[in-house]
């Protein structure tokens, strides 16, 4: 039997969902222009690196912390990790991109659901206290829908895999079938990545591969581009 609450959260994983994810490569375009990423095999290597070395130690750990803070009604903890998500994201384009995507996701979530937590989160932004982040909003929405933290993280990882693969299909380019083969291969690694996220300590938050950040920074100087970041 289909769990409709899970489906409601999965709706936000659609690569065509209007959060602006289609406009961001998070440094992938720099690798493509250097021809470091140029086919399915090299894209999969980059995607593994991005998911395991950057997303895991930023969004992933933050989602776990936010979920437990929601259970404990710990607003200060949510504000703290939200601020850290913003300031530890050193590349300007990815930092601004996350803020824009977070703002769009929050507004869409409020248009669809009456969540007190998401409304509170939005109000913090309106009062100039924080910048909004998609990982925090996605966690709040999953919590509101009664979805367990393991599934929330799984769906968020899938969302990133799906949107980045669609962007790679356009930019490298790859065929649509090749893109679906990438997603199929990456799905097999989602559970392992999620379990790793759940095992990490909070002190691990913010660790990332310098090469990813450097290429995200260098994207600012790419003259011919199809992505904002």
Swiss-Prot record:
Transmembrane segments: none annotated. InterPro entries: UreF (IPR002639), UreF_sf (IPR038277). It comes from the Bacteria. GO terms for molecular function: nickel cation binding. Its main location: cytoplasm. The keyword Cytoplasm applies. Keywords: Chaperone, Cytoplasm, Nickel insertion. The keyword Cytoplasm applies. UreD, UreF and UreG form a complex that acts as a GTP-hydrolysis-dependent molecular chaperone, activating the urease apoprotein by helping to assemble the nickel containing metallocenter of UreC. The UreE protein probably delivers the nickel. Belongs to the UreF family. Required for maturation of urease via the functional incorporation of the urease nickel metallocenter. This is Urease accessory protein UreF. The lineage of its organism: Bacteria, Bacillati, Bacillota, Bacilli, Bacillales.
